[in-house]
């Protein structure tokens, strides 16, 4: 099976790539395991060199259809769509957030539709699609009420993927990820970046500012 990871040079993309290579197989459309033959990592920058002949990298703009057409062919059995502009940056730069989080996602789905081979598309959405007061247990059908541009873009992309799946163009799956903590390196532009900083920075002997009150509740997932 040929597998594509968008955002393949990012924190989660690199970890996912490493895990897929270790595993060496994925479940195919018939429910049986298929050997991982090729792993394509697409991002705007080059990632780590895995030293594995199965890995290839495409450096380019995911919003460019020509780049996606290079990355996706009829042998691409699974796509992990991780590429995104994070929450704080999407709020600060509306056009960039729309271009990458929404327009590029639709272009990816359109390339899949044009290929006509119905690949599995796993889309990493976010709990930012929710908002306001939530029930104690959040269900799959809990109403979406995004309160940021990032959350709205993720919610719209979810609906697009569901409709492309309903029409039989792709086999779509959505994962609504919470805040991932602790991320290594310097803080990114995510609104929840402090959730890593309040742990990471003190461990490095550095000061960290927590911009939210102690009563704040967060969903967290360890990498």
Residue ranges with predicted function:
Residues 1-26:
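N-terminal Rossmann NAD(P)H-binding glycine-rich loop of SDR-like oxidoreductase domains
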Residues 22-41:
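Short mixed-charge
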Residues 103-147:
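Conserved Rossmann-fold NAD(P)-dependent oxidoreductase catalytic core, especially the SDR/UDP-sugar
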Residues 132-134, 147-173:
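Active-site Tyr-X1-5-Lys
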Residues 162-217:
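NAD(P)-dependent short-chain dehydrogenase/reductase
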Residues 63, 92, 96-107, 144, ...:
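Glycine-rich NAD(P)-binding loop of the Rossmann-fold in SDR/ketoreductase-type enzymes
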Residues 59-100:
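NAD(P)H-binding glycine-rich loop region in Rossmannoid oxidoreductase-like domains
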Residues 6, 42, 79-83, 121-127, ...:
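SDR active-site strand-loop-helix element
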